[in-house]
Regions:
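N-terminal beta1-alpha1 ligand-phosphate binding loop
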Residues: 2-31
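N-terminal beta-loop-helix "entrance" segment that forms/cooperates
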Residues: 39-55
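Helix-loop-strand module that forms the ligand-binding subsite of alpha/beta enzymes
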Residues: 53-106
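Secondary-structure boundary/capping motif
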Residues: 13-16, 45, 80-81
């Protein structure tokens, strides 16, 4: 069975993107395990000295590294992604690179 991390790319509790990931998790359960991950608890990116990454980001990176792929469900705000997702991606590319050579579906 394949294992995926499903990033909920918004902090809205009523998001259609959240519902989409929940639908995928339920309806593809026999073929893949999809762990839904909230990103609204990640601190604002601030480029800290010594490239110290917050523990919550390190934990997320470990989940991504262990997964077979990543599914990002995100709304589009003003022709871009939400700030909460941009923030998470900034941390996930600051000295750690868990998504390199990892299949990602948006």
């Amino acid at each position: 069975m394949l294992n995926f991390v499903g990033l909920i790319g918004t902090n809205s509790k009523e998001s259609n993107n959240r519902r989409l990931l929940q639908f995928m998790q339920k309806h593809f359960a026999e073929k893949a395990a999809i762990e839904l991950v909230e990103i609204d608890n990640i601190p604002l990116f601030n480029k800290p000295a010594k490239m110290k990454v917050p523990e919550v980001v390190s934990e997320l990176a470990k989940k991504i590294e262990a997964a077979d792929g990543v599914i990002i469900a995100t709304p589009e705000y003003d022709h871009s992604i939400p700030a909460v997702l941009q923030n998470a991606l900034a941390w996930l590319s600051y000295g750690i690179f868990p998504m390199v050579n990892k299949p990602v579906m948006i």
